[in-house]
């Protein structure tokens, strides 16, 4: 590749990221659903479950977190609280209107609007988290993520069941797993659930791989149970190909085979990643 075309757009007149705490995951997810179904033009929207919320606050390393934690608990935002971060990008007029309408919807579901401090912290550190993987590995901790998408009717139950399946997969080994999730990409008809899990490395690489497969398999079976797609944006690949037929059915798989055969009759374009 020697040339590329890129899209450009004007810098926005205004852009900020805001934080909102909800008393529970149920209230937060309903607020997210209503924001997107009302087509508010937010540029970013994310809801962390209670465990991810606490992990995010702890890892922020900010001195104000302890004071904020105490204050939140005093007014009813305790162990089940969830953090939403949303962004608004555009003209000043659009910015003000969207902020006003989003804040009103959040308050409808018990949301506590906390301004831009939390959102700004996320904005500054959002690309740093992936670099923790190597440091954690050197410290004896493995980290992985998995993502999927489901209709709204299944989001609430599946968002708890998927991390729980990962935890239970390791319980027979008397191993603890830190598994949490957030809603990332959201749509009028559903949302992507993004799960992160951390677990202790074993001395033997083969045993570590086997345990990882156990967790991945149980999470994938749970996802299938709730009718989700095996991947939202990471792709199917060799890790997920086993679960694709159950999602697409015989006719769907035949269609995929036909498309690949038509565009790649010699099987040269990354073969073996779907079937």
For each predicted feature, which ranges?
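General beta-strand structural signal in soluble alpha/beta enzymes
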Residues: 2, 43-47, 115-116, 232, ...
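Shared catalytic-loop signature of beta/alpha-barrel
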Residues: 203, 208-210, 215, 222, ...
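Short, conserved aromatic-histidine micro-motifs
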Residues: 13-31, 215-220, 253-267
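C-terminal substrate-recognition/cap domain of FAD-linked oxidoreductases
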Residues: 8-10, 21-22, 29-218, 226
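Activity-critical C-terminal alpha-helical subdomain
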Residues: 236-275
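Small/polar glycine-rich anion-binding or flexible loop at a beta-alpha turn
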Residues: 49-51, 186, 229-242
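FAD-binding core of FAD-dependent oxidoreductases
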Residues: 1-12, 230-236
């Amino acid at each position: 590749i020697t040339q590329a075309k890129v899209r450009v757009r004007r810098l926005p007149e205004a852009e900020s990221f805001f934080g909102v705490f909800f008393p529970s995951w149920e209230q937060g997810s309903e607020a997210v659903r209503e924001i997107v179904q009302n087509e508010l033009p937010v540029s970013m929207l994310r809801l962390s479950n209670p465990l991810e919320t606490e992990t995010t606050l702890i890892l922020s390393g900010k001195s104000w977190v302890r004071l904020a934690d105490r204050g939140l608990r005093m007014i009813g935002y305790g162990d089940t609280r969830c953090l939403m971060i949303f962004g608004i990008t555009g003209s000043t007029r659009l910015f003000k209107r969207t902020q006003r309408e989003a804040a009103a919807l959040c308050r409808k579901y018990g949301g506590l609007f906390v301004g831009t401090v939390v959102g700004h912290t996320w904005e500054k550190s959002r690309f740093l988290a992936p670099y923790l993987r190597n440091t954690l590995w050197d410290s004896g901790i493995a980290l992985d993520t998995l993502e999927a998408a489901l209709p709204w009717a299944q989001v609430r139950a599946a968002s708890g069941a998927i991390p729980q399946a990962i935890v239970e997969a390791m319980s027979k080994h008397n191993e603890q797993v830190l598994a949490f999730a957030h809603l990332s990409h959201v749509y009028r008809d559903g949302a992507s659930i993004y799960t992160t899990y951390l677990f202790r490395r074993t001395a033997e690489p083969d045993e570590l791989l086997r345990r990882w497969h156990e967790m991945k398999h149980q999470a994938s079976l749970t996802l299938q149970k709730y009718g989700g797609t095996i991947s939202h944006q990471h792709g199917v690949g060799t890790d997920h190909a086993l679960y694709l037929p159950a999602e697409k059915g015989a006719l769907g798989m035949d269609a995929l085979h036909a498309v690949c055969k038509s565009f790649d009759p010699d099987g040269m374009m990354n073969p073996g990643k779907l079937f």
